[in-house]
């Protein structure tokens, strides 16, 4: 597998064709929808994130989304930032729930746990340690695996600002081995990822620039990773957030019921323990 990217396929025209939408998802493991979320709701969430960065002293008063830049993602208190972003208002807004239910074809439950991201441009560091290596969310989250990850940009993304890359159809091979990758760390702990040797030449990486209002949903066993923000001329912030969604009738595990700040506040735990709620001897 090489880091060359083809575009996501736009699935928006399939939203009203249940059979075609399910067929595409079963084959490719993702659904990319353009402009389906209320842009004003997304903008409000972006403004809340901006105000959080200002309140915590990482951006000057009067900074706008167009002028925002911060020195470091890692310097921001991630738990404190969650007090400023009312993401559940977006995830569970009636207009948003209609989108989720159209994708699933049934009533849904949106996880209480949300991840928020505010990455400044770092063109001299191609892979900052806080980025995630190739992995499957289903390795961490359970016990049921019928959830889908929903990833949205709060500001426009470009090939420079990066985003999330997915390996087309990789979900069909099921769960894969994840090994510790010392060059990727979260909360001071090494993060597990999938060895590159695990991938076949047919598992093409996909990435497309996205606009606020777009959403990418993918399978629990979709192999994916974060791409760095290396934007220049202009350098831009990447602001995004993601959660998981599952059928309302399914079992609800620890990550589904526990807000991220509750699981993240224990500094002694690495990412595996935080997501599962179960202490582990090795992350």
Swiss-Prot record:
Enzyme class: oxidoreductase
Species assigned in the record: Streptomyces arenae
GO biological process, alphabetically ordered: antibiotic biosynthetic process
Cofactor(s) needed: Fe cation; L-ascorbate
Known catalytic reactions: 1-deoxypentalenate + 2-oxoglutarate + O2 = 1-deoxy-11beta-hydroxypentalenate + succinate + CO2
Protein keywords: Antibiotic biosynthesis, Dioxygenase, Iron, Metal-binding, Oxidoreductase, Vitamin C
Protein name: 1-deoxypentalenic acid 11-beta-hydroxylase
Disulfide bonds: none
Enzyme Commission number(s) from the entry: 1.14.11.35
């Amino acid at each position: 597998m090489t880091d060359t990217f083809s575009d996501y396929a736009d699935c928006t025209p399939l939203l009203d064709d249940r059979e075609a939408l399910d067929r595409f998802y079963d084959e490719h493991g993702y659904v990319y929808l353009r402009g389906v979320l209320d842009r004003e709701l997304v903008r409000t969430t972006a403004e809340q994130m901006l105000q959080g960065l200002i309140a915590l002293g990482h951006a000057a008063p009067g900074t706008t989304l167009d002028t925002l830049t911060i020195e470091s993602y890692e310097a921001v208190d991630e738990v404190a930032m969650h007090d400023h972003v009312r993401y559940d208002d977006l995830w569970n807004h009636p207009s948003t729930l209609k989108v989720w239910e159209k994708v699933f074809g049934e009533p849904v439950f949106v996880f209480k746990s949300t991840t928020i991201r505010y990455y400044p441009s770092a063109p001299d560091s191609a892979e900052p340690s806080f980025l995630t290596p190739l992995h499957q969310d289903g390795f961490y989250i359970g016990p049921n695996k019928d959830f889908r990850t929903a990833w949205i940009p709060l500001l426009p993304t470009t090939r420079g600002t990066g985003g999330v890359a997915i390996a087309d159809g990789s979900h069909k091979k099921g769960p894969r081995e994840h090994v510790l990758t010392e060059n990727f760390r979260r909360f001071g702990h090494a993060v597990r990822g999938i060895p590159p040797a695990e991938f076949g030449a047919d598992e093409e990486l996909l990435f497309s620039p996205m606009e606020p209002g777009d959403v990418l949903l993918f399978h629990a066993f979709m192999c994916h990773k974060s791409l760095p923000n290396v934007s220049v001329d202009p350098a831009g912030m990447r602001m995004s957030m993601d959660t998981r969604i599952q059928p309302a009738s399914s079992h609800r595990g620890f990550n589904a019921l526990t807000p991220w700040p509750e699981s993240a506040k224990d500094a002694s735990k690495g990412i595996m323990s935080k997501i599962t709620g179960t202490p582990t001897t090795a992350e």
